[in-house]
From Swiss-Prot:
Phosphorylated on serine, threonine and tyrosine residues following TCR stimulation. Phosphorylated by LCK on Tyr-452 and Tyr-486 upon TCR engagement. Disulfide bonds join C43-C85, C59-C125, C80-C132, C106-C116, C201-C267, C244-C250, C285-C321, C301-C358, C316-C366, C341-C349. Residues 439-494 are annotated as: Disordered. This is T-cell surface glycoprotein CD5. Pfam families: SRCR. The gene is Cd5.
Length: 494
């Protein structure tokens, strides 16, 4: 082998040795398993190495590390890269990370575990800790954000009343909601659309529209505390079209207004209604008309709105009486207080005006469906009359009965007495002498029309001598062959 070949072989060996040495230093301890513990991040914590299938902490005095944490950090770049973290920041002991576990002490080059020994529990050595930068999070490039649009409301439109005037039901400030957008409605005094008011009251199931309230009337008497809690929303709607037929057509959005006046309505079904009664008459259906406000009863003063019969007919129905009979005004004391209703009917009176001097009252008379019965004195008189009638019948009844029977028998005796056959032309007449004598002896019988009805009582002369003789003979010798009670043959012989 010549010198040239020897030189080439030596160069090759030196290159191989240099490559080996550079490879070892470049890997910088990547041949060991390292992890960081004791924190919530994988990029900071106590250094633990895997030896003998166990994870062990490393004493901070190992590998002759300096006290400068930042200088030591340069030697831990390979470890941070292996942990997929950023650049190293500090390497050394940290009092906050002091949890040794199977701790070892290593010598030699940094991150070499060829010369590591277990330490005793008596050795006071803080574990070695490492802090690396957190890995950078890769975020996708920003995309163009579409413009935000407010979706159209899907809930059906609705109305709501915030109680205002004296806390009455079906009265108050009107709020309109369309989806999630809600608010009160701007009210303009020049606009008084009756159709819109009826639509609002009908939608709220409160009957028909009565009136709008101005700001002063809407304030009125304050409502109870429990009803004043809900405050009306600000004005966000207006009603440009008063002749609309649906809620969505009636209202349109407007800018929020704090100083404007909100729409306030009173519907016919407001509650509670005015209570009324009639006092001072003979029954509950007659008397002076009185009304009640809260717990106070006062007379209802006469007003121009009550000139017709409508108010008083309604009052009669309210008292469960019949039809209205009459009504008239009655003078009252000048100091007598009362209430005044400005509406035509009491059912429309949402507010009663207090008056200190009620000069004219109204006396109303309604038909009483349940009139009073008979007085006790009248009933007693009727009973006494019936008792007397029964006693009278008991005393006089038999006498009257006897007289009636006797009169009936006398009528049966008034019959013709004379011949009944064809050839029997003989008749019996009272003699004139007997008749005159009987009238003289019995003057009371002269007025009798039928001279046969009452025979003479005090006369010794018979009025019918032939007849009496025949009767006497026939009674002694009865003849059954004759149909008559008188023996006519004997009478003919006489």
């Amino acid at each position: 082998m010549d010198s040239h070949e020897v030189l080439l072989a030596a160069t090759y060996l030196l290159g191989t040795l240099a490559a080996f040495c550079l490879g070892q230093s470049g890997r910088g301890g990547l041949d060991i398993q390292v992890m960081l513990s004791g924190s919530n991040s994988k990029c900071q914590g106590q250094v633990e190495i895997q030896m003998e299938n166990k994870w062990k902490t490393v004493c901070s005095s190992s590998w002759r590390l300096s006290q400068d944490h930042s200088k030591n950090a340069q030697q831990a770049s390979a470890v941070c890269k292996q942990l997929r973290c950023g650049d190293p920041l500090a390497l050394g002991p940290f009092p906050s990370l002091n949890r040794p576990q199977n701790q070892v002490f290593c010598q030699g080059s940094p991150w070499s575990i060829s010369n590591c020994n277990n330490t005793s529990s008596q050795d006071q050595c803080l574990p070695l800790s490492l802090i690396c930068l957190e890995p950078q999070r890769t975020t996708p490039p920003p995309t163009t954000t579409p413009p935000t649009t407010v979706p159209e409301p899907t809930a059906p439109p609705r109305l709501q009343l915030v109680p205002g005037h004296e806390g009455l039901r079906c009265t108050g400030v009107v709020e309109f909601y369309n989806g999630s957008w809600g608010g009160t409605i701007l009210y303009k005094a020049k606009d008084r659309p009756l159709g819109l008011g009826n639509l609002i009251c009908k939608s709220l199931q409160c009957g028909s529209f009565l009136t709008h309230l101005s700001g002063t009337e809407a304030a009125g008497t304050p409502a109870p505390a429990e009803l004043r809690d809900p405050r009306p929303l600000p004005i966000r709607w207006e009603a440009p079209n008063g002749s609309c037929v649906s809620l969505q057509q009636c209202f349109q959005k407007t800018t929020a207004q704090e100083g404007g006046q909100a729409l306030t309505v009173i519907c016919s079904d407001f509650q509670p209604k005015v209570q009324s009664r009639l006092v001072g008459g003979s029954s509950v259906c007659e008397g002076i008309a009185e009304v009640r406000q809260r717990s106070q009863w006062e007379a209802l003063c006469d007003s121009s709105a009550a000139r017709g019969r409508g108010r008083w007919e309604e009052l009669c129905r309210e008292q469960q009486c019949g039809d209205l009979i009459s009504f008239h005004t009655v003078d009252a004391d000048k100091t007598s207080p009362g209430f005044l209703c400005a509406q035509e009917k009491l059912s429309q009176c949402y507010h009663l005006q207090k008056k200190k001097h009620c000069n004219k009252r109204v006396f109303v008379t309604c038909q009483d469906p349940n009139p009073a019965g008979l007085a006790p004195g009248t009933v007693a008189s009727i009973i006494l009359t019936l008792v007397l009638l029964v006693v009278l019948l008991a005393m006089c009844g038999p006498l009257v009965y006897k007289k009636l029977v006797k009169k009936f028998r006398q009528k049966k005796q008034r019959q013709w007495i004379g011949p009944t056959g064809v050839n029997q032309n003989m008749s019996f007449h009272r003699s004139h002498t007997a008749t005159v004598r009987s009238q003289v002896e019995n003057p009371t019988a002269s007025h009798v029309d039928n001279e046969y009805s009452q025979p003479p009582r005090n006369s010794h002369l018979s009025a019918y001598p032939a007849l009496e003789g025949a009767l006497h003979r026939s009674s002694t010798q009865p003849d059954n062959s004759s149909d008559s009670d008188y023996d006519l043959q004997v009478a003919q012989r006489l």
